[in-house]
Amino acid sequence: MSRVAKAPVSIPAGVEVTLNEQTLTVKGAKGSLTRVINNAVNVVIEDGVVKFLPVEGVVNAWAQAGTTRALVNNMVVGVSQGFERKLKLVGVGYRAKLVGADIDLTLGFSHPLVHKLPAGVTAECPSQTDIVLRGVDKQLIGQVAAEIRGYRPPEPYKGKGVRYDDEEVRRKEAKKK
């Protein structure tokens, strides 16, 4: 049984949460997010908190309630504080620059890669080898970061590639003769 669903999500000042049938909308200073709630979960908004209750008789209702609680908590944090993900480019000649709403990546291929950023994600390049992605939707930020990392994942011998800022790359020893 999930214990995550038992903890309510507190609504901070400046954040408005509304429920219209099965659609939950969270509005805050940084933007607004909308999510359709699973039928196995009842959502109750009262006294500045959002509570999640499983529907009786539905298999895995507690699991769905816990998942819904985590997603709604991410929505509340996103519209109030926002999320950011940092990427680091490691390798000779690997660089990134911002061109309008796109990121121009040079990752050792014979051609430059241009990654178009979706709506709701902003990027910043403090240096040629660093990328900072910001936005209100945690899932979207993680998806964009994973797509950029997927162009050239870190390899285990020299550690070259695109990695998350907090990622530790396991290194292998080269073959000995």
From Swiss-Prot:
GO CC field: cytosolic large ribosomal subunit
Pfam families: Ribosomal_L6 (PF00347)
PROSITE patterns: RIBOSOMAL_L6_1
InterPro entries: Ribosomal_uL6-like, Ribosomal_uL6-like_a/b-dom_sf, Ribosomal_uL6_a/b-dom, Ribosomal_uL6_bac-type, Ribosomal_uL6_CS
Statement: the UniProt record of this protein carries the keyword Disulfide bond: no
GO molecular function, one term: rRNA binding
Gene3D superfamilies: Ribosomal protein L6, alpha-beta domain (3.90.930.12)
Protein name (Swiss-Prot/TrEMBL): Large ribosomal subunit protein uL6
Organism in which the protein naturally occurs: Shewanella sp. (strain W3-18-1)
Lineage, highest ranks first: Bacteria, Pseudomonadati, Pseudomonadota, Gammaproteobacteria, Alteromonadales
